[in-house]
Structure formats: structure tokens, C-alpha cells
Amino acid sequence: MGGTRPEATLHNRLAVLRVERNLSRQQLADALDVNYQTVGYLERGEYNPSLDLALRAAEFFALPVEAIWSRAPFPPMSVQLYEATP
């Protein structure tokens, strides 16, 4: 009974990481070797990255893939920061 499973949306922190580093969409697109519109689609969750693109983003930001992409929504950064401080 092999059917095709609908593709799940991946949640990401791409926009947060881009803004933290003061990068435009075009600058990030150039670094990842994609069109700037692709960056917008990724940030809005309208497009899931290929494995290669996800790995390139992780390498560019020097973060593990799971820090950028997740199947579950990320909690707000403020929640994570305050939970981490004693």
C-alpha cells in the first residue's frame, strides 16, 4: 500500500539568523548559492530545503542542522534564553 506521504513543512530560524548577522536576503542567497527568492520562500516555510541546502546553511551559520530546521515549531528565542539562565 505504498502511497505518497504529503511533505511536512519544516520550521526554521533562517530569518532570525540572517537578521542577527545583518545580512540581506540577497547576501544570504549568494552565500548559499541560491536565488534570493528561495531565501524568502524558505523563511516563510513555503519551500523545504534539499538536504544539500540545509547542510550548506548549517555550515554557513556554523550551527548544527537541528538548530536551524525542525519538524516542530521552535519556541520563541526569549523563552529559550530565560529557561537557560539560572
What are these regions (language model features)?
Residues 19, 30, 59:
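Alpha-helical residues within the helix-turn-helix
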Residues 19, 33, 44, 73:
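Residue-level detection of the helix-turn-helix DNA-binding "recognition helix"
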Residues 2, 59, 69-86:
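Short, charged recognition helix plus adjacent turn
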Residues 1-20:
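A short, Lys/Arg-rich alpha-helix, primarily the initiator
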Residues 22-41:
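Short alpha-helical DNA-recognition segment
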Residues 25, 36, 46-47, 65:
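The DNA-contacting recognition helix of HTH DNA-binding domains
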Residues 52-67:
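DNA major-groove recognition helix of helix-turn-helix/homeodomain DNA-binding modules
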